Amino acid sequence: MSVMIMCVSLMSVFSIVLIAKQPISLGLVLLSGSMIACVEIALEVSSLLGFLLFLTYVSGVMVLFLYVLSIYPNEVYRFNLEFVMIVSSCCAMMGLVGLMNYEYVEISGSIIFKVYGWSKGVKPMYPNSSRFAVCDVSGVVFVYKNHSAFAKSKMSSS
């Protein structure tokens, strides 16, 4: 789950690059992207490796940022409507990802095969999972509470 959150947050942070036109906003995007990657490395692998990677990223970003600022003329930084809309939609997506119920979902997809096998006599994976069915469509996981309607629709389509 943490890998999925990292990917969504990195995609949302780096999508701001498309509308960032000034070096200050580009530097902030690079810095926040490196911070997200370093936190993920620190959580998944090692805190020491994450810290060293963070120091490397921050030093590189600071040198690049200061170089670009010395070349680029100073301008007033203003938020435009596109920027506000993208940031608010990214925050909303992150909030929705945090609210998802992962109790009946496995990333490996084995529960999906169990759902399709219920009509063939395969035992459900979880004790009370006969009420739930999972369908994975283009990376979005849907949990259906009415298993009989889901099974009937699958049997009629095949």
Curated annotation (Swiss-Prot):
Entry EC number(s): 7.1.1.2
UniProtKB keywords: Electron transport, Membrane, Mitochondrion, NAD, Respiratory chain, Translocase, Transmembrane, Transmembrane helix, Transport, Ubiquinone
Localization per Swiss-Prot or TrEMBL: Mitochondrion membrane
Coarse class of the protein's main subcellular location: mitochondrion
Known catalytic reactions: a ubiquinone + NADH + 5 H(+)(in) = a ubiquinol + NAD(+) + 4 H(+)(out)
A GO MF label: NADH dehydrogenase (ubiquinone) activity
Membrane-protein topology: Multi-pass membrane protein
One GO term describing the cellular component: mitochondrial membrane
Residue ranges of the TM segments: 1-21, 48-68, 79-99
Similarity field: Belongs to the complex I subunit 6 family.
Described function: Core subunit of the mitochondrial membrane respiratory chain NADH dehydrogenase (Complex I) that is believed to belong to the minimal assembly required for catalysis. Complex I functions in the transfer of electrons from NADH to the respiratory chain. The immediate electron acceptor for the enzyme is believed to be ubiquinone.
Listed name of the protein: NADH-ubiquinone oxidoreductase chain 6
Species: Mytilus edulis (Blue mussel)
Source organism phylogeny: Eukaryota, Metazoa, Spiralia, Lophotrochozoa, Mollusca
